[in-house]
Swiss-Prot record:
Protein name per the record: F-box protein At2g26850
Entry-linked InterPro entries: F-box-like_dom_sf, F-box_dom
Signal sequence annotation: none
Domain F-box stretches: 59-105
Family annotation (Pfam families): F-box
Species annotation: Arabidopsis thaliana
PROSITE patterns: FBOX (PS50181)
Lineage, uppermost ranks: Eukaryota, Viridiplantae, Streptophyta, Embryophyta, Tracheophyta
Length: 371
């Protein structure tokens, strides 16, 4: 019996070494080896005589694993393989579509660019006629086959799906899996903000504008639709990269003045973003600026009283000295939209407290001073 057990374990060991496993499988190989070895050992203790023709090994599958190791394996699977695993049988399907597995993938890939407004828009999208299942609004579920057909572009693993067995199933519309796949396939346009819109056009350097975004998995970039400017058509930009996108830091409409709550605490050297629009028909964008010193101040921090002044200087140092865009004055006590049709209109202000946000603006700094 011991010889039989030794031969079996060694055969399994050398066979597993010869296989080429995906990255996630290498992390679970030891777990599976331990479980199967334990299974063989415990069964050998109960057998009086060896049964070389026993079909136990041939019938064993991943479903024979206890819940804990099985869940650990599923948590290591990438989204495309989770979808494939969900088609194996009904038992695995229930596990593979559960929210707790997909929430990790959603947060890892999409968390930094999905803000509260995106989640609100998703709920509206589910009940809109633009949803995938809108022609059949009587049902509240999407077929798994339809979802997987949308995921085929994610991985070549789906190219042979027609030769695999199909299981009827459904996924709740409000599930995290549905949310992830709708983002991944570009079916859902979500709200976010884009740095340096329109491919870094000189007129938008060091700005961030609201947009609706759709992901293109083939290029790993986004298509952006910007709010219309008055009677102008919606501006569309393609090939927007991940690093140019952020979730909106504040819940403010691009057409409304943001109510500032930090004006009294601002002092020279603070980094801020301020709303600005070309005219009343344009939406606001957020522009990077630094609080400067008053003309009457020599800049010596030991004697500076600028933070006590009713007026506040904002500097846009990406523009050359003497440019009309270089500086502007804001009344911190009675702040409201300020400007004219020639210089544009300045709106609400928010202080930047996050070092990562400040570093992002610095990385976007133009290579040459603007006029």
């Amino acid at each position: 019996m011991l010889l039989y057990l030794l031969i079996t374990c060694l055969s399994f060991f050398f066979f597993s070494k010869s296989l080429s496993f995906p990255q996630w499988a290498s992390k679970t190989k030891n777990l599976l080896s331990f479980y199967f070895s334990k299974y063989l050992f415990t069964n050998s203790l109960h057998q009086i005589t060896p049964d070389l023709a026993s079909p136990v090994l041939g019938k064993m599958s991943i479903l024979d694993l206890p819940d804990l190791p099985l869940d650990c394996i599923l948590e290591l699977l990438p989204p495309s393989e989770l979808c494939t695993m969900a088609r194996v049988c009904s038992s695995l399907r229930e596990r593979c579509v559960s929210d707790h597995l997909w929430e990790k993938h959603l947060k890892t890939k999409w968390g930094k660019i999905l803000g509260p407004s995106a989640h609100k828009e998703w709920q509206c999208y589910l009940s809109s006629p633009y949803h995938l299942d809108s022609p059949h609004h009587k049902t509240s579920h999407l077929g798994l086959a339809k979802i997987i057909s949308l995921m085929r572009s994610l991985s070549s693993i789906f190219r042979d799906d027609d030769h695999r067995r199909r299981y009827p199933s459904s996924i709740p519309l409000d599930s995290t899996m549905n949310f992830y796949l709708s983002l991944e396939t570009g079916r859902f346009w979500f709200p976010a903000q884009v740095y340096n819109r329109e491919n870094g056009h000189v007129g938008f350097m060091l700005s961030c504008y609201d947009a609706e975004l759709s992901y293109d998995t083939d290029t790993n970039t986004f298509q952006a639709r910007y709010p219309p400017h008055g009677k102008r058509a919606i501006a569309v930009e393609k090939d927007v990269t991940w690093e140019r996108i952020r979730a909106a830091p504040v819940d403010a409409s691009p057409h409304n003045l943001y109510v500032s709550d930090s004006l009294n605490e601002l002092k020279p050297g603070d980094h801020i973003e301020i709303q600005w629009r070309r005219n009343k028909e344009f939406p606001y964008g957020w522009w990077y600026s630094v609080v400067g010193h008053m003309e009457s101040c020599d800049g010596n921090l030991n004697h500076c009283q600028c933070h006590n002044s009713e007026m506040m200087v904002l500097e846009f140092n990406q523009y050359t000295v003497g440019s009309r865009w270089r500086k502007t004055m804001i009344n911190r006590r009675d702040h409201r939209e300020k400007g004219n049709e020639e210089d544009g209109f300045y709106g609400g202000i928010r202080k930047i407290n996050c070092k990562e946000d400040i570093e992002m603006w610095k990385r976007l700094w133009p290579s040459s001073i603007l006029e």
